[in-house]
Amino acid sequence: MNTMKTTYIVLELIIAVLSIAGNVLVCWAVAINSTLKNATNYFLVSLAVADIAVGLLAIPFAITISIGFQVDFHSCLFFACFVLVLTQSSIFSLLAVAIDRYLAIKIPLRYNSLVTGKRARGLIAVLWLLSFVIGLTPLMGWNKAMSGCPNSTNETGADHGAGHHGCFISCLFENVVTMSYMVYFNFFGCVLLPLIIMLGIYIKIFMVACKQLHQIELMGNSRTTLQKEVHAAKSLAIIVGLFAFCWLPLHILNCITHFHEEFSKSKPEWVMYVAIILSHANSVINPIIYAYRIRDFRYTFHKIISKILCKTDDFPKCTTDNNQHLTVTNVNAPAASVTI
């Protein structure tokens, strides 16, 4: 094993540990702090669960694949597809949060009755199901079985056809997943399109908020709460932006590989390693953003860590002074409030 691959594996293991620790902290915070139990944060928990799975399962799979060991074709294909499931779940969670924030600021009077915790949990279940369908699509036939298996042999040295489970190959991502799936279906249809939709939603959120701030004569308190809503939208938009920053390089490399086959043969090995590490590092970022930008999470993280380090018996309840509420207020109407 060369130095570059060893460095890659060490960095992946560090990312895995940080991802698991940080996102378990997010789930723990929502579980113990009642002010964090709302539809928006349920979507963030879904995102955290996907990031935990990245650290717990996807990164070990990625390390295994990078080694290129000999394994049954469909087992290798499952390893390769699993990270696609988690990526798709993250995309859907971010899209759900964007739509949730748009509804909160666009129809504040109906928001609380329309967006409930029960509906959010049901939607999360549906989105995870869709993520599995999309991510595991290569297992249904859109893969490199025909080109990957005919010349491969099993442990006894006997040749096997593409459709047989005894087909053993060197388990590398590009040996099992077609670039046509990765580029046209996964990237263009299931990653880039939702990112463009989210960009449009957040632009619309800021336009609506600015219009309300400038055209409606709000009372001091109402103006403050609307500004808090805008601050929250900015925090979530940052998360989307960082997701795009971390994942687009890998997808761009896939596009170049697909449209320029000679690049796939000549590209430096380190380029792909950097792109993969960057994509996995995204799973570490979100808890940091929550702690830095969202007061409720910061407060609860502090209490959890204090409890662990100081061995305190009870978890102190949050006071309203330490909570950041996302509230959209309409003139002459009660506020629709949700805390994240």
From Swiss-Prot:
Gene3D superfamilies: Rhodopsin 7-helix transmembrane proteins
Extracellular side: 1-6, 66-76, 143-178, 260-267
Membrane-protein topology: Multi-pass membrane protein
Principal location listed in the UniProt entry: membrane
Keywords: Cell membrane, Disulfide bond, G-protein coupled receptor, Glycoprotein, Lipoprotein, Membrane, Palmitate, Receptor, Transducer, Transmembrane, Transmembrane helix
Glycan attachment sites: 151, 154
Residues covalently joined to lipid (S-palmitoyl cysteine): 310
Function of the molecule: Receptor for adenosine. The activity of this receptor is mediated by G proteins which activate adenylyl cyclase.
The protein's name in its UniProt record: Adenosine receptor A2b
Organism name: Gallus gallus (Chicken)
